[in-house]
Amino acid sequence: RGAALTAVLDDAATHCAYAFELGAATRRAVTQLQNNSHYRFSAVQLGWIGFGWRGAAAQGWRGFRSFGRGYQPRSSNAQALDAFYRGQVRSECGVGRQVAQLATQRELFGDAGFNEAFTPGELSIGTFLTLHDTDSILLGAHAGEFFADGKAVQTSQLGRQAFVGAPGFIAHVFDKSYLDDIHNQAENFVVVDVSDAAAQALAQHGGFAYYDARNRQIWELAKQLRGPGKRRFERLLYERDAALRATLDPQQQTQLRQLQTLLDDPFYQGFSVYVHPKGTKPIGYHVARLLDRNPRTPYAIDLTLHNLRTTLYWRWIDWQLQRCGAATAAEQSIENSATPAYAGRGTLH
C-alpha cells in the first residue's frame, strides 16, 4: 500500500495539480508584497535589510549576522512574514526574491502549516552567501535536491505552469566595468504567470538562450535611439509614450518599429515576473528598463537553482498527509466517544 501511495504522489498528474496550487499561492504572495507601500528598496540604512524605526524584533525577526546580513523569525513564522506584508522594511531585490519564495510557502501551507512545518532557521533571509551557512529551505542545509535548469531548456518543455513560482534573475552580460548603475547590475525575480503564447514560444525556441540573443539584438538597435531622459526606453518601448515617439526622426522611427517588433514577441509580453520593488510586470518591461540603467551592456535571463518540485513538493505532501492523518484520528475519536457502551447489545428507543 505504501508503494502504491508513493507512486500516486509522484505521478505527473499529482505534480501538475501541485503546480496549479503553487501558482495560486505565488500570485497571492506577490500581491500582498506589492500592495505594501512600506516595503521599499534599499536606501540609506544601517544594514543589508532595514526594519525601520520599529526594529527587527518588534516585527518578528531576530538577527544572527552583523550589518543586517542575516535574520530568522523570532517566534511565529507567519507573523514574521507579516512584516513584509504590512510592516516597514527595506531590502534589495535579492532579499525581495527570497521573501516572495517564502511568502509563497506561507500561502501554500496556510499560517498554521507554515508555523508548524518549517523551523525558524529554514526561513532565514539575508545575503545569498549567508543562506548557504544556515538551515535555509531555499539555499541552505535543508534545501535538499536542487533542480538546475538555468536556460529553462527542460522547463520550457513542461508547459506554462512549470515556470510559475520559479526563481531567476536578469544579469549583465559584459563585466562590471561596463556598468553605469551598479544597483541595477541584476534583477532577481519570481515567475508569476506565463501566457499560453509565451509558453509556446519558449517551447518552440528551447528556453531562454534564444531570448538572450534577442536581448543582444534589442540592445544593438537601441544604441541608435539613445537620448536625454532617465526613463527614455521605458517610455518609448513599454509605455509607448506617443509624445516622446513623435520627437524621433524618420530613421529613428524605423528603428523603433524594429525594436517594437522584437519586443512584441509573446515571451516579452506574456512572461510575467515579480521583482522587488517594481511588482509584477512582463519581462519585456525589465529589458526596456535596463536599457536606461546600463546602456553599455546587454542582459541575459536565467532560472536559479530551486527545489519547488523536489524538497518543497515533498514537504507539502508530508504536511497534507499529516493533516489527513490527524483528521482521520479525530473522526475516529468522535465516533468512539459517541458510541454508547451498550451499542453492541442493541439500543433502546
Model segments located where?
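Cysteine-nucleophile amide-bond enzymes
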Residues: R1-P167, F174-Q185, V191-H349
